[in-house]
Amino acid sequence: MPCTCGNWRRWIRPLVVLLYIVGLLVVVPLCVWELQKLEVGIHTKAWFIAGIFLLMTIPISLWGILQHLVHYTQPELQKPIIRILWMVPIYSLDSWIALKYPNIAIYVDTCRECYEAYVIYNFMVFLSNYLTNRYPNLVLIIEAKDQQRHLPPLCCCPSWAMGEVLLFRCKLGVLQYTVVRPFTTIIALICELVGVYDEGNFSFDNAWTYLVILNNMSQLFAMYCLVLFYKVLREELNPIQPVGKFLCVKMVVFVSFWQAVLIALLVKVGVISEKHTWEWQSVEAVATGLQDFIICVEMFLAAIAHHYSFSYKPYVQEAEEGSCFDSFLAMWDISDIRADISEQVRNVGRTVLGQPRKMFFAEDHEQNEHTSLLSSSTQDPISDASSMPSSPMGHYQGFGHTVTPLTTPTTVPVVDGIYNTSATRDTEESPELMHNSSEKALDRS
């Protein structure tokens, strides 16, 4: 029998805190014992200091994740948020392990790098799901806007048509990095096994240089598409304060990447040389260790920023339903990713064959993260929800969009804002939007 809101929300947080304290009582003595056993040098001190930052980082991140699971009232918004919040503990833990065991750093760091692409994808999903719920006629709204020109350095390229074309290309631009990064990571592992990777050495005789260039181009284009997407829909996204969220994601991704490039340049020009390896086996190991140490420190600051930027407070409701198991299971559900990739591949195929693409945004109902998220709906959602199968995962519809609530409503409204009568207001505005859209099209022609 699943644990309901009547009990599990009361004991889950104290239980997690207790488990973390027990973990500290086990891990801290082991780290101190390891520090006393080894010769205390730069490498050992760096590993121990990084461990202190790790122990401060993880509880901040886990608390935010736990609070979202406890108040899991908006699955289509909170699922990508939880995935983004996992970035900090994954980055921090991977870097600390790689710092301790330099020989396996290449294998541990690959997990961190793949999750980086996953985070960018989920941020796009978060924005898309919010807009889909808030504005059922989003394509018409975009078509009614002035033509958005490309941003530097692509300002000389032809502009993307406002509407479905722009949405499709922005989302495809983000999704391509989710595919490219794991692919290049697998290539990097193979090159390391055959001895041609040579990480941290800028030379066109090794594979690392080419993979860095490819990853950088793919990452920059993904971030460019995110910026262009925000530029077009800035007014519509203002209620969820996307700038702080975007900076949190962008800073972690870009800072970690470019500081690795900077450290590699320091190795190339001889600032980091064989004369000072500080207990590491090689100069490349020094570069990797320095990168891992800096990431452990940075993740503590990132955890604080994520805690405030991706707060759980807008999702707190007085009458919350759902089981502990469903909330936990939904966090690990990746069916939307498979559906997104399949849908984008089909859309690309339709474009190549000259067939019409499937519309991204199906009609939905209004939702707002801060105000209407907590407001009461006057419409009875029971009749609407009865036609939908109950599932904690929801049903995929478009780019990462789920429309089925966590639980089927009984006497209280489902997630506030999803079945909101204000959606009718948006629907009624569609003739005006269509009229404005046609005028914009005539002006552009």
UniProtKB/Swiss-Prot annotation:
Acetylation found in the keyword field: no
Region (Disordered): 369-393, 421-445
Major localization listed first in the record, in broad terms: membrane
One CC-aspect GO term: membrane
Keywords from the named record: Membrane, Transmembrane, Transmembrane helix
Regions crossing the membrane: 15-35, 46-66, 84-104, 177-197, 210-230, 252-272, 285-305
Ranges annotated as biased composition (Polar residues): 370-390
Stated family: Belongs to the TMEM184 family.
Name this polypeptide is given: Transmembrane protein 184C
Source organism (scientific name): Gallus gallus (Chicken)
Gene coding for it: TMEM184C
